[in-house]
Amino acid sequence: MPAFRLPVRQLVEFLLRTGSIDSRFTGFDRANEGARIHRKLQKAAGEGYAAEVFLSGEREAAGIPFTIEGRADGIFTDEAGVTVIDEIKTTAVPADDIAEDMNPCHWAQGMVYGAICAQQRELETLDVRLTYYQIDTDEIIRYTRHFSAAELDAFLNDLLRQYLPWARRQLDWVEARDRSLGALQFPFPAYRPGQRALAG
């Protein structure tokens, strides 16, 4: 069975996102503005800060192989020698209202990247840092949490267990589609020159 490919953000938001009419984290022009601010903060972080780090990890849940992947905003090693996953978020929420537990998806995203990074680098511990950039005042608010690799691993495995019903549905649909396509007959008595090669 081929691996079920799952972007980190999709996994986290599918399971943990809650409804809200608060659009201060998203918006029409926010994506471009957010990307510009990400680059600004990443550049200011200095030497030793790796920006936009692609991470991909293999996991299995109930016999289904998963490939979980995405780009961590930043990874660096702090003064104490601890690897830190930096998750950057731009927001219009007033700085006084930017709380550590404001959005569980933000921590979850960093923790999933942390689980993959810890596995790849064989780390026993790792920090996840949320960097909030307030777009109206240019204020930067940071929160950091320390995790063991075992905690991060258990967190990711739990998310995958929760996601299993949807993964199974999608895999069943793909299997049914492929069976149906395999049973289709070519609607004409013969292929035209080159048509068979094009059809595969």
Q: Which residues does each PLM region occupy?
A:
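Metal-dependent nuclease catalytic cores that hydrolyze phosphodiester bonds in DNA/RNA
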Residues: 1-82
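Mg2+/Mn2+-dependent nuclease catalytic core
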Residues: 58-153
